[in-house]
């Protein structure tokens, strides 16, 4: 919804989360198994720590029993991050998003003597032990630490990484003002958190793949007819992309290709699987390009989607609504902090898009015709710097940028892994054109 520039559709989601967090989030945080947290000092009516393991209904009510999943509040918080990143709405940040995310993080990383936090530090790293990643804890009952149930699940590690990075970013930008010791705690946990779990496939042997958790180790692929939890580190955890370290990106690509997620069809993972395909894909040089992804996606659509566009998978309601993210990300990606134009689209196939919304509150349009990217236009809503990968990688020199009919200075900046990026300053409300 956000990348489609239809963020208003998500408007009803946020009050549901905020109402329950304010009403019961602190109670659950103080009562949670192995993770009691009686933190005070919350903002805007929010408890000092928030935690919930159930499905929520409007008006601060629950609509199901305890599912045991400790990551639910983290999961819910990701949409708050996405809404702010795509809009740069500082009122939403300070009044709604930051108070919630700060309280959710407190349950995990701690908030003083009355809230030690769920994570444990062992051998110099913070570990997540027994958070019951799957509904009902069918991986094993709740058990006292250090019983290794669900050790460092990909879901919790990735979601916590994304949450902490966001909190640190908005603090360093001066948009929020956490106490110095709290900011230091976030930075320490992020720097020393257990990594995304990676292991080896049973077949073919010695093939690195993403795992759903460090332990217990499942035979890969992890689940059939179920939700492949290892994908969540890619999306919506957003911790793996084309600029990730080669070893991690290779493991992610192997995971996508080996998991065979359409045979059998997965339980309720449509909205995670295909964005993950796209975000670790490539336009040339690997199997994960748009042609492969669209063919694979069409198998699921033909088998399980009705004439009204509703995908008949496990779960209920909007659990399986998520195909638009995958399609948009084939044309434009920005979750890594910079723009990528047609990141998985074969250059031999024409394509175009108009006013997709990118991180940084940019509205972006472009076309690909005859193997050449043209008509790149960026509307800046918030006046932030715009950083991008040149879609003319074989052209020497800086791309040209103009705004209001005048040239705009473009600077070369180093991206992750030595990636070459370009950056220019923007003014809020101004339209910019990028050309070779």
Per-segment meaning from a language model:
Residues 103-170:
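Acidic/histidine-rich catalytic neighborhood
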Residues 65-67, 149, 224-225, 354-358:
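Short Gly/Pro-enriched turn/cap motifs at secondary-structure boundaries
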Residues 284-436:
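Non-catalytic C-terminal accessory modules of carbohydrate-active enzymes
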Residues 72, 124, 156, 232, ...:
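Residues that flank catalytic or metal-binding motifs in active/ligand-binding sites
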């Amino acid at each position: 919804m956000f990348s489609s520039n239809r963020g208003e559709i998500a408007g009803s989601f946020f009050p549901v989360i905020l109402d329950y967090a304010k009403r019961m989030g602190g109670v659950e945080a103080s009562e949670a198994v192995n993770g009691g947290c009686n933190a005070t000092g919350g903002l805007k009516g929010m408890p000092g720590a928030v935690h919930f393991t159930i499905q929520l209904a409007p008006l601060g009510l629950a609509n199901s029993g305890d599912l045991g999943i400790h990551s639910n509040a983290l999961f819910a918080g990701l949409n708050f991050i996405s809404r702010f990143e795509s809009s740069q709405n500082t009122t939403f940040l300070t009044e709604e998003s930051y108070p919630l995310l700060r309280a959710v993080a407190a349950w995990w990383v701690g908030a003083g003597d009355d809230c030690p936090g769920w994570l444990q530090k062992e051998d110099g790293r913070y570990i997540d032990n027994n958070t019951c990643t799957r509904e009902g804890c069918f991986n094993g009952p709740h058990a006292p630490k250090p019983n290794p149930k669900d050790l460092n699940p990909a879901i919790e590690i990735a979601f916590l990484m994304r949450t902490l990075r966001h909190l640190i970013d908005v603090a360093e930008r001066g948009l929020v003002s956490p106490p110095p010791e709290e900011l230091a705690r976030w930075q320490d946990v992020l720097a020393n958190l257990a990594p995304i779990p990676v292991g080896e496939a049973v077949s073919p042997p010695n093939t690195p793949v993403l795992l759903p958790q460090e332990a217990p180790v499942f035979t890969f692929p992890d689940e059939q007819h179920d939700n492949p939890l290892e994908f969540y580190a890619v999306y919506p955890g957003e911790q793996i992309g084309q600029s990730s370290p080669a070893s991690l990106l290779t493991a992610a690509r192997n995971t996508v290709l080996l998991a065979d997620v359409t045979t059998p069809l997965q339980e309720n993972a449509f909205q995670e699987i295909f964005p993950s395909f796209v975000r670790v894909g490539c336009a040339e040089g690997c199997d994960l390009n748009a042609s492969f992804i669209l063919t694979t996606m069409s198998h699921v659509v033909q088998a399980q989607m009705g004439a009204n566009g509703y995908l008949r998978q496990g779960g209920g309601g909007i659990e399986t609504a998520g195909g638009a993210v995958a399609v948009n990300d084939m044309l434009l990606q920005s979750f890594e902090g910079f723009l990528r134009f047609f990141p998985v689209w074969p250059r031999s196939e024409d394509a175009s898009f108009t006013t997709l919304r990118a991180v940084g509150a940019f509205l972006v349009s472009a076309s690909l015709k005859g193997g050449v990217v043209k008509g790149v236009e960026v509307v800046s809503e918030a006046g932030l710097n715009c950083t991008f990968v040149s879609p003319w990688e074989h052209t020497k020199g800086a791309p040209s940028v103009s705004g209001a009919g005048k040239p705009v200075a473009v600077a070369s900046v180093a991206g992750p892994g030595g990636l070459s990026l370009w950056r220019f300053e923007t003014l809020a409300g101004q339209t910019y054109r990028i050309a070779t």
